Curated annotation (Swiss-Prot):
Keywords: Cytoplasm, Hydrolase. InterPro entries: Urease_gamma, Urease_gamma/gamma-beta_su, Urease_gamma_sf, Urease_subunit. Belongs to the urease gamma subunit family. Pathway: Nitrogen metabolism; urea degradation; CO(2) and NH(3) from urea (urease route): step 1/1. Its main location: cytoplasm. Its EC number is 3.5.1.5. The keyword Metal-binding does not apply. GO terms for biological process: urea catabolic process. The keyword Hydrolase applies. The lineage of its organism: Bacteria, Bacillati, Cyanobacteriota, Cyanophyceae, Nostocales. It catalyses: urea + 2 H2O + H(+) = hydrogencarbonate + 2 NH4(+). This is Urease subunit gamma. It comes from the Bacteria. It holds the Pfam family Urease_gamma.
Amino acid sequence: MQLTPQEKDKLLIFTAALVAERRKNRGLKLNYPEAVAYISAAILEGARDGNTVAELMSYGTTLLTRDDVMEGIAEMVHEVQVEATFPDGTKLVTVHNPIR
């Protein structure tokens, strides 16, 4: 299987997000990479589902709360940027202050 660098990045994000989701479901608090992967994967999937950039920017702020992450992580994640593939092309989605 031949994958482009972008496809490899998306696969890595998905794998990290899967680990994060399992840990979250077990009641563990997520660390920085897990939180970013969790939000990024949700944005990528939302774009694939046909949501708009504005919808995904809003949706990205609803995925995790301060209770879901380790102490200090919410302050570390100022924004999450994801280059997502939409039906009309690739666009950059930026979620500001995603963990509230």
